[in-house]
Amino acid sequence: MPGNSFGRLFRISTWGESHGVGLGVVIDGCPAGLELDLAAIQAQLDRRRVGQSRMTSARREPDEVEILSGMFEGRTTGTALAMLIRNTNARSSDYDAIKHLYRPGHADHSYDAKYGFRDYRGGGRSSARETAARVAAGAVARQILATMGISLVAYTLSLGHLKAQIIDENEIENNIMRCPDPAVAEQMIAYVDQARRDLDSLGGVVEVRARGVPAGLGEPVFDKLDALIGHAMFSIPAVKAVEIGSGIEAGNARGSQNNDPFIQRADGSIGTSSNHAGGILGGISSSEEIVVRLTAKPPASIAQEQTTVDQAGEPATIVVKGRHDPTVLPRLVPVAEAMLALVLVDCVLQQRAARL
């Protein structure tokens, strides 16, 4: 199975399944000498892990990271940095009754069509549990970016018809929806609770921002920064749309409204007075804040009875049991941050190699 690696100079390869021994990631190209803060890596994994609130799956996994190689006396060695996260609370018996049925909205049929064989336990490799490995790698990338003054923040912007009306970043970690508007967060929580009672699930939008990004990151034509971001974000399970800057709203604007006028900042650098472009022009970072939005579908695993077929194509009904998220949004927040961090650190390293 190809397609398990991402990046060029800072390249990650993830491995593992939802109900296997564990998951992990190998990072090639991590610069030597980085003082690696393991507590910071664990903190990001804790934000993504299951069982942290009633907005997430009831599966209990500590997601404790183990460094297997690439670190000595607290610093990276420049060799492959390998990290392991063990599975300790898988309950594979939940899937015994449906292992021959195709779950609506899942990759069961497409995996069978491609490989002729699949791991039916929690989706195997297609499970969103794989993103734990990405978050671990992204936490390393964030530490490198922090040395350059680059920071990232993400939050739940909307859930169904409910949308944050204010963006107070101090409120993001103060509620279980990771919404920057505390009043709307309470409405979101109630909406998810109702969906759970209805044996249903909900989708929405996560917004992620990167600040302190210098101008010049990204390559022309096929490796544009926005193309790389799209690649990264669309690889996240459940993500169905990605917008940068004004996104689809740009299609409703005139050029005079969508253009960002150039200005000279107080420090003498060049910037823009607005940011409809989302910090990227011609596929290259402009030094303005990078703004990305991800639309996530409702989780496909719901406890309602649904119609389907079995592997022989015979009609059947299915009820997906087990422990599942009623919405992916709170846990998508750290995953989105991680993927943007991975794109940016790779582009930073490429830019350093691009000119004397």
Swiss-Prot record:
Reduced FMN (FMNH(2)). Its cofactor is FMNH2. Pathway: Metabolic intermediate biosynthesis; chorismate biosynthesis; chorismate from D-erythrose 4-phosphate and phosphoenolpyruvate: step 7/7. It catalyses: 5-O-(1-carboxyvinyl)-3-phosphoshikimate = chorismate + phosphate. Pfam families: Chorismate_synt. GO terms for molecular function: chorismate synthase activity; FMN binding. One of its GO terms (biological process) is chorismate biosynthetic process. NADP(+) binds at residues 48, 54. Homotetramer. This reaction introduces a second double bond into the aromatic ring system. This is Chorismate synthase. The lineage of its organism: Bacteria, Bacillati, Chloroflexota, Chloroflexia, Herpetosiphonales.
